[in-house]
A protein has these predicted regions:
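Phosphate- and other anionic-substrate recognition elements at nucleic-acid/protein interfaces
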Residues: 1-115
Length: 115
């Protein structure tokens, strides 16, 4: 199974693609979609959407794994990340990908073994 994992944001969207078979992961590709702080917010969301859509088209994942929204004290950041998650989820839904959401702590523990 090919999995696209995404760390959502509106400044930087980190992504990685792995193939999973027989309890083993094999890296396929990884990168980031970066947006410029000097660009209007709606344009940044468009860039996130286009970048994620391109990754989906190029790598052909079967599922999307994404971090759930983590509440922070900075409401402006939370709202921005929520909007970015929305366009990421839209790109995945339009591609017909099943979406699996995980809390940030669970992602950290799975990747590092602790957290």
């Amino acid at each position: 199974m090919r999995v696209l994992g995404i760390d959502p944001g509106y400044a930087i969207v980190g992504w990685g693609v792995v193939d999973y078979a027989g309890n083993r992961f094999a890296p396929v590709d990884f990168g980031a979609v970066c947006t410029d702080a000097g660009v209007p917010f709606e344009r940044r969301l468009d860039e996130v959407y286009a970048g994620v859509k391109d990754v989906i088209e190029r790598t052909q994942p079967e599922v999307l794994a994404i971090e759930k929204l983590f509440y922070q004290h900075n409401q402006t950041t939370v709202i921005g990340v929520a909007a970015a998650r929305g366009v990421i989820l839209l790109a995945a839904a339009q591609a017909g990908l099943p979406i699996y959401e995980y809390p940030p702590m669970q992602v950290t523990q799975a990747v590092t073994g602790y957290g």
